[in-house]
Regions:
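Bacterial N-terminal signal peptides that target proteins for export
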Residues: 1-9
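Cleavable N-terminal signal peptides
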Residues: 10-11, 21
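Short gly/ser/thr-rich secondary-structure transition/capping motifs
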Residues: 12, 74-77
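N-terminal signal peptide c-region/cleavage motif recognized by signal peptidases
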Residues: 16-19
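Serine-esterase "nucleophile elbow" of acetyl-processing enzymes
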Residues: 22-70, 80-88
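Flexible, glycine-rich phosphate/dinucleotide-binding loops
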Residues: 37, 73, 137
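Acidic-and-aromatic substrate-binding clefts and catalytic sites of carbohydrate-active enzymes
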Residues: 40-42, 70-75, 105-108
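Alpha-helical cap/lid subdomain in secreted, periplasmic
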Residues: 50-60, 76-174
Length: 174
């Protein structure tokens, strides 16, 4: 009987290790415009990629999908939000940028679009972080619109504690 118990315990331990090894990573999708996409910086330097590296360094098995699209506005983001953020996503990061105002949109419409995106995502049980801070000027490139490599690092470092807190507060631990 003791052998049977040990055999069952060993099988359960192997099963637990096997299922954990095949567990899918936490999916996080970064939605935005050119700064999210990494316009003007080297591959792997955009904040979504940097955030993924930082999360993994903290022991979080996360895949951060970059759904940034240059020249996009919040209206465009709203129009593609369901396609850009697949089912199974745990967190969506909305980084709306300034194209609405640059392309003569109103602040009110921009705010309404951000609220509508967040509402649609939450209705799908996706946690939402709206990241729309005043980014320090030293992190902008010569054009005053796009971020430098250091600007992307700043965003990733700023988002990291928010993502970790969101995972702790609203998600089942893995």
């Amino acid at each position: 009987m003791l052998r049977l118990g040990r055999a069952i315990a060993a099988l359960l331990a192997m099963w637990a290790v096997a299922t954990d090894a095949f567990a899918a990573p936490i999916i996080i999708v970064a939605v935005g415009a050119s700064n999210t996409s990494g316009w003007g910086v080297a591959d792997g330097s955009a904040y979504p990629e940097r955030l993924q590296v930082m999360l993994r360094a903290k022991g979080v098995d996360a895949q951060v999908i970059n759904a940034g699209r240059p020249f996009d506005t919040t209206g465009g983001m709203l129009g593609r939000i369901d396609q850009s953020v697949p089912n199974g996503t745990r967190i969506a990061i909305l980084q709306p940028g300034g194209n609405d105002l640059r392309f003569l949109g109103s602040r009110e419409q921009r705010s309404a679009n951000i609220a509508a995106m967040a509402s649609r995502l939450r209705a799908r049980n996706i946690l939402v972080i709206v990241f729309d801070p005043e980014i320090p000027r030293q992190y902008y490139a010569w054009d005053g619109i796009h971020l430098t490599t250091e600007g992307h690092a700043w965003i990733a470092a700023s988002l990291l504690p928010q993502v970790l807190a969101t995972l702790r507060a609203g998600a089942k631990p893995r």
